[in-house]
């Protein structure tokens, strides 16, 4: 009976995390053929953002330089020039193919993530029973921890998220989110987010300690500040 009771929170957590992912993954596989066919049939020329447009234009400019080089090599034999033209043509076809694959990848991943968040939001509204079970289990688990362990955990998490060495971790995390949504990485935006997120989290943490922990467990606050110093 106790084992069955202990497995209920685990099943609730598993359903909350993996059920939306499984549904969105299934939708992605179902949409893949339709999106690919739609893109290739319509031959869409829509660029999803200015960064992608600059990237593809840069590649075309590189090919244009090769064509200009072709004109400068008129003294080469006709066979050599034909080989050069064939190579440039193949590179152009490959560039267009890569561009189409990138656009399809962007559309699929963006749509999949939107579906995932919609399902997760709906699940959080409709799946009240699972959330109540999970919340009670988390509160019971935290209640059984000593103040020292709680303070150590808070200190560890804060150092990982807003500590001196957290910058590289934030860059990897935001970069992976960019990639997951199918967008091209923008170093300027990532640098701005990396310099902003830790400050916001640090402010929220201090406010939480001041308003909540001081009221619930003053001894935990004392231990936390002692360890932090």
Swiss-Prot record:
The chain crosses the membrane at residues 114-134, 189-209. GO terms for cellular component: chloroplast inner membrane. GO terms for molecular function: antiporter activity; proton transmembrane transporter activity. It comes from the Eukaryota. GO terms for biological process: potassium ion transport. Disulfide bonds: none annotated. It holds the Pfam family CemA. Keywords: Antiport, Chloroplast, Hydrogen ion transport, Ion transport, Membrane, Plastid, Plastid inner membrane, Potassium, Potassium transport, Transmembrane, Transmembrane helix, Transport. It is a multi-pass membrane protein. It catalyses: K(+)(in) + H(+)(out) = K(+)(out) + H(+)(in). It is found in: Plastid, Chloroplast inner membrane. Belongs to the CemA family. Contributes to K(+)/H(+) antiport activity by supporting proton efflux to control proton extrusion and homeostasis in chloroplasts in a light-dependent manner to modulate photosynthesis. Prevents excessive induction of non-photochemical quenching (NPQ) under continuous-light conditions. Indirectly promotes efficient inorganic carbon uptake into chloroplasts. This is Potassium/proton antiporter CemA.
């Amino acid at each position: 009976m106790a084992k069955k009771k202990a497995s209920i929170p685990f099943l609730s957590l598993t359903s909350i995390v993996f059920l939306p992912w499984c549904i969105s993954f299934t939708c992605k596989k179902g949409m893949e053929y339709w999106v690919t066919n739609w893109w290739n049939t319509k031959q869409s020329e829509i660029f999803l953002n200015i960064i992608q447009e600059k990237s593809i234009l840069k590649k075309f400019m590189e090919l244009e330089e090769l064509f200009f080089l072709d004109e400068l090599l008129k003294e080469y034999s006709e066979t050599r020039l034909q080989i050069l033209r064939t190579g440039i043509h193949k590179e152009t076809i490959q560039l267009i193919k890569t561009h189409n694959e990138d656009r399809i990848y962007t559309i699929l991943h963006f749509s999949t993530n939107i579906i995932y968040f919609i399902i997760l939001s709906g699940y959080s509204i409709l799946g009240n029973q699972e959330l109540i079970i999970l919340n009670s289990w988390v509160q019971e688990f935290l209640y059984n921890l000593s103040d020292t362990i709680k303070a150590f955990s808070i200190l560890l998490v804060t150092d990982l998220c807003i500590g001196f060495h957290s910058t590289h971790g934030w860059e990897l995390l935001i970069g992976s989110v960019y990639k997951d949504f199918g967008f091209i990485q923008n170093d300027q935006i990532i640098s701005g987010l990396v310099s902003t997120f830790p400050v916001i989290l640090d402010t929220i943490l201090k406010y939480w300690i001041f308003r909540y922990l001081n009221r619930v467990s003053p001894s935990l606050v004392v231990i936390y500040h002692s360890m932090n110093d």
